[in-house]
Every structure is written in C-alpha cells, then in structure tokens.
Amino acid sequence: NPFPGILGYEDSVIPDTERALLSQHNILFLGLRGQAKTRMARQMIDLLDEYIPIVAGSEINDDPFHPVSRYAIDLIEEKGNDTPIAWLHRSQRYGEKLATPDVSVADLIGDIDPIKAANLKLSFADERVLHYGIIPRSNRSIFVINELPDLQARIQVSLFNILEEGDLQIRGFKLRLPLDVLFVFTANPEDYTNRGSIVTPLKDRIESQILTHYPKSLETALEITEQEAAINDKKKKKVKASDLIKRLIEQVSFEARA
C-alpha cells in the first residue's frame, strides 16, 4: 500500500490516485471532513526520489540541467561544470497552503520586491528583483491547496496559466518559468454554498477529480477509530470498553451519516 495508515480506500480512492499520478495529472480530492484528503497528499512525498540535485542557492529548486531562474542560468553560464550543487531531500519537496480569504496573488505567485531592487541597484524591469511566491518555490515538488473553494475567484483565475501551460507570469514580466509542480487540491462540497465555489475554468484544468468517502464497513470504521484514538496504556488500564459498545458507537455514526 503506497499510503500506509489509509484504511478503506484500497478499492476506490487509492487506485484512482495511482492512475492520476501515473498520468501526471493535477488532483482534486473532493470529500467531507475527516476523510484523509490532506493526509494522502502529504504521503505522496514518499513516492518521490529520496534526493534530487538543485543549483545551490536557487530559490526555486532549479534543475542543474534545465535551469529556469535568472540566478541559476547566470551561475551556470559563469561556472559551467563547476556550478555548486545542493541535494534536496524529498521531505523538503512539499508545500501546503490553506486557502483563506486573505491569500493574495503575491503570496502564491510572487511580486516585485522594491527593497531588493534598491539594495542591488536594479531597475524594476530586471528579472532579479522578483520575489517568488510559494508556488515557484515549490518547483519540482508537490504543492497542496486545502479548502480550494475558500480561495477568492480572482486568485483562482491566477492559477489558470500554471495549470494549463505549466508556466507563470509575474506582474507583466515577459518571462516564462516552466515549473514542474504537482498540484493537489482538497475541497469539501458542503462548504460550496457557505463560503464560495471553484470557478468552472479552474475545475476544467484539474485533470483528476477523486471522490473520497467515509468507511463503508463497520470493521474498517473500527480499525480507523482504533488507529486514530490517542489512548495511552495508562488510560487503557483504567477504562475498559467492550467490543459491543465500540460497535454500537460506530453503528450510530453510520446511521447518522445515512
């Protein structure tokens, strides 16, 4: 099982996720609370190579053979085969952002940094004055946006280009950054009417929509509760719960959801 600790998805969500990953699709996990959407996204880093080489000092994890940032391109032109290399562990190749109403385009994509321009005595037309947002900094990584409907429509629109073409534009700069990012989005359909929605063109650009679900059997539900309950040995000695009580509690949950 590529997703240890995820129970009840062996014949539904996990095969769908495997197919989406093999197809190099961006993924939307659509489901209610407590259905392991974010946990599955976080466990995807275990499928990555343990280490990858990057150009040392690069803000956006430039591939030494295919640099995209001005910093890495200039450094490789200057030093050639002597370009310093750093090794990035897979645990560092994961970015996550909770969609809230105050998230801006600058947070996600980037903006011009006037302080950097002043310190380096550079014009605002120079590529080196850019301050990269969290998405470019997640180049060659997995980037997760939780609760996508909460993201304002104009912010969702800013993701169109990177999802469709794999590149982005910052503040009208004529630069093309062909980023290598796997996007994973999570959304709760119950929240659509309360707080917002996913704009249709964005939904069209997310190639795989995977529906998560609550456990379908009582046995799976019992296993999940046993796994997730934070009960230490001291508590277990003091409190005894019969198997019948546990089953009744799970059955009540099943009936309530029905």
PLM region spans:
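Conserved ASCE/P-loop NTPase catalytic core
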Residues: N1-Y214
